[in-house]
Amino acid sequence: MSLYPNVLSVSNKYGFINQSEQFEDRNVASDDVRNYKIVHRGDFAYNPARINVGSIAMLKRFNSGIVSPMYICFRINASIVDPSYFELFLQSRAFKDEMEIRLEGSVRRCLSFDAMCEIHIPCPNIIEQCTIAEQIGKISSKIELEESLLTAYANQKDWLLKQMFI
């Protein structure tokens, strides 16, 4: 039995998730997890063959876990680059363009860690990075709230239409 009960995967939609959530109908983790990599809250990991579809994330949901040896795991120096700012950079067009240039291979294109480290990150001072991340976080929260209100209004409309034509 592993000391790390969370066997994790990185989803392009949800970030770090338990493998059991991603692969509900089967257990994909090896019985021998000795070669698995340990990740802690704040660490980043990506699948080098799936980063082009967004399979890179920072661990936030769990305190720790393990990931398949195929993942590249790293931690950034938070005194130089704010983790939330870096996370936003990973979602940017600038990152995607830089990544695309560095992908290697023809069928399953991969991004090595060395190639990842070559990507230039525009870095204002740490205080400004934190301010940017905080402001974008507020905007994201507002968008989530508005989307949930829109869903509620759509459900209410559907209910009213059903009641009108019973």
Regions found by a protein language model. Name each.
Residues 122-166:
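Amphipathic alpha-helical coiled-coil/heptad-repeat segments
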Residues 1-123:
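DNA target-recognition domains and sequence-specific DNA-contacting regions of bacterial/archaeal
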